[in-house]
Design a protein with these regions (language model features):
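Acidic-enriched, low-complexity/disordered segments with a strong bias for Aspartate over Glutamate
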Residues: 4, 22, 28, 56, ...
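Glycine-rich nucleotide/cofactor/substrate-binding loop typically near the N-terminus or early
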Residues: 45-113
Length: 143
């Protein structure tokens, strides 16, 4: 088992970041997380999808005190988000000094780039389907 191999302990999840392009089943997941008293933080469209169902969710903008910019190109790329994902228990003093709250889980999927290519969309539209934040979230959470 991976947890045994890497001497990893099971940890309770207190806070999750959700940022998805494909929102299928995301409301069910958010409802389940909320029922477990897990704080949910989310981006733009995902935030709208979850909040309109009456599920308690906090926007990334509320944490960063900074709006999505550049037509939504920059949402999660912020030290208060990535610091919360990358922080280790040993970083707690640094996190506290900079008001960074830890994330215990990240739920993310990527823009449908392959689908856009197969539809033959124009280059400008295709460039907009190149995901930057999603892969960054996935890499940070893996680390």
């Amino acid at each position: 088992m991976v947890t045994d191999q890497y001497n990893m302990e099971r940890r309770r999840v207190f806070r999750v970041l959700i940022s998805v392009s494909d929102k299928e089943n995301i409301v069910d997941l958010a409802r389940a997380l909320h029922s477990l008293e897990i704080e949910i933080v989310s981006t733009g469209g995902t935030y709208q999808t979850i909040s309109k169902e009456g599920i308690d969710v906090m926007s990334v903008e509320k944490i960063t005190n900074f709006p999505e910019i550049m037509g939504g190109r920059v949402k999660t790329l912020h030290p208060l988000i990535f610091g919360g994902i990358l922080a280790r228990d040993s970083d707690s003093k640094d996190a506290e000094k900079h008001s960074i709250d830890f994330f215990d889980m990240v739920v993310c999927n990527l823009y449908p780039f392959r689908e856009a290519v197969s539809k033959g969309v124009d280059l400008e539209s295709l460039v907009e389907k190149i995901d930057i934040g999603g892969p960054s979230l996935l890499r940070a959470s893996a680390k």
